[in-house]
Design a protein with these regions (language model features):
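Catalytic cores of carbohydrate-active enzymes across secretory and cytosolic contexts
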Residues: 1-205
Length: 205
């Protein structure tokens, strides 16, 4: 997509110790993606430890994979999670052109749509949930489920891997807020599957 004439910005976090200069913008493989810029969000080592290593992996990851009895929910971790999501939203709001489409990825950034919509109502917001979305009975163990569902409902589009996960999300949303279905559209009538090898490189922002 970005190898053509389309321009875009990838907003990503980068660990920053708080000492020395921090480069907020950098290129990403300029020969292959000349129109793609990286906007770096500085996170302290403590932010990374709490937001990603501890909270995302100890609270949300086991819940999403239906191991709710292993989840550890801490209010102080949730507050750090909110602060990091707000940083992502602010950086995105600063970078996005008027009426641009913003594509947000996965549960680590659940609260970005809420913050972003408040700052930039002109944007078209899409969210893809790469991780499995469980049944409402499982998701309801999350203490902040209403805040999370409310944030996701700020999106113009929400994508999931399979129809069952869509149904799970709708059930969770129905339990959190009163709503009604105003329209339905069928998905593709047939699917084509094929196998392929996927190479995974590494990139530090």
């Amino acid at each position: 997509f970005f190898k053509g004439e389309h321009e875009g910005t990838w907003v990503a976090w980068s660990k920053h110790e708080g000492r020395g200069r921090f480069e907020t913008h950098t290129d990403f493989e300029p020969e292959s993606y000349p129109n793609l810029t990286v906007r770096r969000v500085p996170l302290s080592p403590a932010d990374v430890e709490t937001f990603y290593q501890r909270f995302s992996k100890e609270a949300f990851w086991p819940t999403l994979h239906t191991f709710w009895e292993r989840a550890r929910f801490r209010e102080e971790d949730w507050q750090t999670y909110l602060q990091v999501n707000q940083k992502f939203a602010e950086a995105t709001a600063d970078e996005a052109a008027e009426g641009a489409t913003v594509w947000i990825h996965d549960y680590n950034l659940w609260m970005v749509p809420a913050y972003l919509r408040a700052r930039r109502p002109d944007l078209k917001i899409a969210f893809f949930h790469h991780t499995y979305f469980p049944s409402a009975d499982v998701f309801n163990v999350v203490p902040w489920r209403r805040e999370i569902i409310g944030s996701l409902l700020q999106c113009d589009y929400i994508g999931f891997h399979i129809p069952r996960q869509v149904e799970n999300f709708v059930d969770a949303a129905r339990g959190a807020f009163p709503f009604k279905t105003v329209a339905r559209e069928s998905c593709a009538p047939r699917f084509q599957t094929y196998g392929c090898a996927v190479g995974l490189g590494s990139m530090t922002s």
